[in-house]
Structures are given as C-alpha cells and as structure tokens.
Amino acid sequence: MKNDIFLKSLKKEPIARYPVWLMRQAGRYLPEYRAIRQKYKSFLDFCKNVEDAAIVSLQPVDILGVDAVIMFSDILVLLEPMGIKVSFEAGEGPVLDHNFDFKNLKSQGISGDLSYVFELLKVLKEKSPVPVIGFCGAPFTLASYVIEKESSRDFTKTKVFMYENQKDFHILMEKLSEALVEYIDHQIKSGADVIQIFDSWSMSLSRFAYKEYVYDYNAFIIKSIKQKHPNTPIIYFFRGSSSHIEDAVDLGADALSVDWSVCINDVCKRYPDLVFQGNLEPQILLLDKENIRKHVEEFVMCIPRDTAFVVNLGHGITPDVSKDNVKYFVECVKEVSYGKRNLFKKC
C-alpha cells in the first residue's frame, strides 16, 4: 500500500494533511464509468462482474487521486441470499419482492451467494495503492427498503409497520443484523481494510424511535465485528446527524461520518475520542472553481487543530457534477490542508 494516510487518520496517527475520498466516487458523473455501465442492462449484473466492478472501483483513485477506494456494489445485494428478490428498474430505483414472512428469512450461511463481493475485495486488495473500504447497509436502512419494497420519500409504511407490528419488525431487524455480521466478517477476511456502515434513512426517525428500535442492532453489529476484527476501523454513516449524534457516539464505531446538519468544529471538540468524516454538501461540487476552493478553505479552517479527520461529503456525489470539479475539489483539500492550516483563523 503506497498511500495509507486514510488508515493513519482513522487510527489517530500523525498525518501531514487530511485524507479525502467521496461517497459514490465511482458513479455516473465519470464518463469512464458510463462507458462500462452501458454494457449492462441490469445494475446487479454489473455489480456481479468482478472484473468491471474492480475497474470502476479503482477509477476514482487513478482519475481523482482520492485516498481510499470503496468497492463498487450496493447495500441491497445482501437481501438476495436472505430470500428477498431485488431488481433495479430503469429510472425508478430498486424494487423488492417478498411476502413479509420475515421469520423464514435466511440469516446465516448467506456468504456463498455473495462470493462475487469477496472476490472483488481480493482483487482490490491486490491492485489498490490506497486502503480498501468494504461496506453494508445498516439494519434500519435495509429494513426500510424491505418494508417499503422500493425507495421512499417519507418512509410512512416503514414507521407504521415499526410501531404497529413491533414483533415482526424486531424479527426483521434481528435477521438483518445476524446476516450483516457474517457479511462484514467475510468482507474483512477478503481484504477490506475499513468497513463503512450506511444508515442513510436514519434521518426519518425521531431520537426516541432511533434509540428504541434501531440503536441496539447497530451496537450489536459493531461490537460483534470488533470482537472478531479489533484492528479494522469501522465508520458509521448516518443522515439526520444532528438528531442522533448523542446516541451514535456510544455505538462503538471508530469514526462517525456525518451530514451537514452538524457543525464539524463543535462535534470534534465535544467528542475528541472519535474520528469524524464529512460533511460538505454535495451541491458544492456544482459551483465554479473559485467558490469550490472558498468552501474548502472555510471547511478546513473549522476543523480543530491536531484533530484526526477524513474529508468527505455529507452524502453521495450527484450525477450532474463535472469530473473536473470533483478532481479540483480533491486537489484543493490536499493543498489547503497540507501544512497550511496556520494561514486560516480558527472558527
């Protein structure tokens, strides 16, 4: 591994600048990605082709110069071996098919049907000059897709089901949690240097609901993986960060990836034992270069001095940004943070 600054930051070792990578860095904004994606009618078929998945995973490292590679896959691939049919409709996102018989979902021995994920990680571990990130969805985020059977704007079905069918909801969460522990374990054994858990839909929950219905499952997964792989950093990404941060800090993750609803300066000072990742708005990448640099400078200025940190967005890159802007953003983060923080006032 030629560049391990990302791992060093997660482990709070001395670094000369902040590492930077971006959620959805392998995606439609890259012409090089689109050239490969067009070969496949099915998104899942694309994910299952190890050779092409490896190529698009590594593209951001070669093109943008990011400090980590995240495997190209989808959080929903775990559901197929559990017994839930998943398809991706053109322009409409994922569609799931099942009969709500959650007690019969398979939660153990699911790894054999996910061998393409583990083969991809082995290839990336061999070829990548930077640390490799494996990932999965958090139980509640996956449960939301299962209950809604598709993407949702307000998660009404999920919350009604959670409150009215508590027994079945907890059965589903338990099954997902058990499967996730096995899945993450195999990812690490296959070469993942870091694991990121995506809880994208935690933003739909009140603090009470998060603590009552979700928290224990997240804590169980992180504790289980830490017992098996104590030296592998775990990042927990959660939207609605301002609502749930007081609970998330106790989950046991090494780092929290937060959205733009929190002040980085504030959370870094309040929770100095944790590493934070984030949290710029993705829309910044749509600005002209002068304004991109301005936002990067202001952001770096707000990170407390001598704080371990990973620069990222508060959510994924949108397809409408230009490759040049993303590359410039990465360059700015490196340049501004490299030994130049003394040029800027503290927040």
From Swiss-Prot:
The keyword Chloroplast does not apply. GO terms for cellular component: cytosol. Pfam families: URO-D. Its main location: cytoplasm. It is found in: Cytoplasm. The keyword Lyase applies. It catalyses: uroporphyrinogen III + 4 H(+) = coproporphyrinogen III + 4 CO2. GO terms for molecular function: uroporphyrinogen decarboxylase activity. Its EC number is 4.1.1.37. The record marks D74 as: Transition state stabilizer. Pathway: Porphyrin-containing compound metabolism; protoporphyrin-IX biosynthesis; coproporphyrinogen-III from 5-aminolevulinate: step 4/4. Keywords: Cytoplasm, Decarboxylase, Lyase, Porphyrin biosynthesis. It is an enzyme of class 4 (lyase). It comes from the Bacteria. Substrate binds at R24, Q25, A26, G27, R28, D74, Y145, S200, H315. SUPFAM superfamilies: UROD/MetE-like. GO terms for biological process: protoporphyrinogen IX biosynthetic process. PANTHER family: METHYLTETRAHYDROFOLATE:HOMOCYSTEINE METHYLTRANSFERASE RELATED, UROPORPHYRINOGEN DECARBOXYLASE. Catalyzes the decarboxylation of four acetate groups of uroporphyrinogen-III to yield coproporphyrinogen-III. Homodimer. Belongs to the uroporphyrinogen decarboxylase family. This is Uroporphyrinogen decarboxylase.
